[in-house]
Amino acid sequence: MPRLLALGDGALTLEFGDRIDAGINARVMAARDALEARHLVGISDVVPTWRSLTVHFDPLQLDRDRLAACLMQSADAPLQESALTARWQIPVVFGGEFGPDLGTVASATGRSEDAVVAAICDLELRVFLIGFLPGFPYLGELPGWLHLPRLKTPRAAVPANSLAIAGAQAAIYPWVSPGGWHLLGRTPVRLFDLADAARPALFAPGDSLRFTAISSADYTRLATAVAAGELESSHWRAP
């Protein structure tokens, strides 16, 4: 049974569970779609996460009890593929200077580097939420044998567009940032672009993606094309 929590006088959170789970996250997305379809005046932001949906609102425009009732009704929305979701195919160059932790991950899991790369590229990962940094996608779930703790000493600066894993999750850093996840590779794809006013973040919660291994030469070629504005975000959409 979903649980409704108040966050001060300007937000409500609807909780569906207490763990990372694709089924729970699908219910979150279904509730989001159902609520947004109501077009309630007074809502300023709708924030889906792994297991909950938080709605920020203006109590002078939208009655709290009315919003609470709408949220509980939205919690029962049928599960279906959201019209807002997209599927992506993201190129990544693995290992070497681009993925300095690939060898460590291979050793820790008892696999070869090639086997780790093949396993990552064989997964279809779900975007559970966007957080931490603008455009930063939390992806899951990884198979159990790839669940590794975060680094004991985080890096002060993780290169932008780095693909990393920690625990049951994978992620891509859209910006240079401190970080304690294991770096496996890097993508030439731009994950956040303010020039795209309609959708500055490439990914959205509920999207899915796969990775494709590329060479360092292909990475350089694609990164150059992206920087020159020759490749739009639609280029990375899966067929």
Positions of the model-derived regions?
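Glycine-rich active-site loops that engage anionic ligands at enzyme catalytic sites
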Residues: 1-239
